[in-house]
Amino acid sequence: ALESSTLPAKLVDCRSTDVERTELFIVEGDSALGTAKLARNSDHQALLPIRGKILNVQKASVTDMLGNAECAAIIQVIGAGSGRTFDLESARYGKVIIMTDADVDGAHIRTLLLTLFFRYMRPLVEAGRVYAAVPPLHRLEVINPGSKANEVIYTCLLYTSPSPRDRTRSRMPS
């Protein structure tokens, strides 16, 4: 079932095929997909939305896991198989980034996805190619008057003081 050469329609793929540069963002739902589309670099960043919580593969059989639409889509998009047949060299992306909401459900979904990767795509984890995004991450575009190119900055809140009154926003280190 997973040998199909066509990728899931919900995948928003990147243009590059250079595995060293490509990144697959697994995002929680179609609403997150819309926001992620606006902030991604389509040259090397692909997006795959998943619907809700995936199957808990720790408790499920291999047959159930492969029959789950979300698990099957993730395995198919990564393109390296699963279990004993997983081939790291066949992976289509250099990095797989889990991007879930900053709530309890998001943490649960992240845990379920990490379990899927650890149980069925462990070489990807062992190679250090699975990441979890830490929300909130904001994309700012600074308009440069008189120039065609605007500066793009990704930021998050970095608290430098325990007092809310003295907290400052800071750029992420480059």
Q: What name fits each language-model region?
A:
Residues A1-K53, F86-L88, G94-K95:
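GHKL-family ATPase ATP-binding module
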Residues A36-G94, V125, V152-I153:
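Intrinsically disordered, low-complexity regulatory segments
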Residues E70-A73, H108-L116:
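Alpha-helical scaffold elements adjacent to nucleotide-binding pockets in ATP/GTP-utilizing enzyme cores
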Residues M99-H108:
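N-terminal assembly/transducer modules of large multi-domain enzymes
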Residues R122-E141:
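Interdomain boundary/hinge elements
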Residues P136-T155:
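Conserved phosphate-handling catalytic cores of large alpha/beta enzymes
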Residues Y159-T168:
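Conserved small/polar residues in nucleotide/adenosyl-binding loops
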Residues R171-P173:
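Hydrophobic alpha-helical segments, chiefly the membrane-spanning helices
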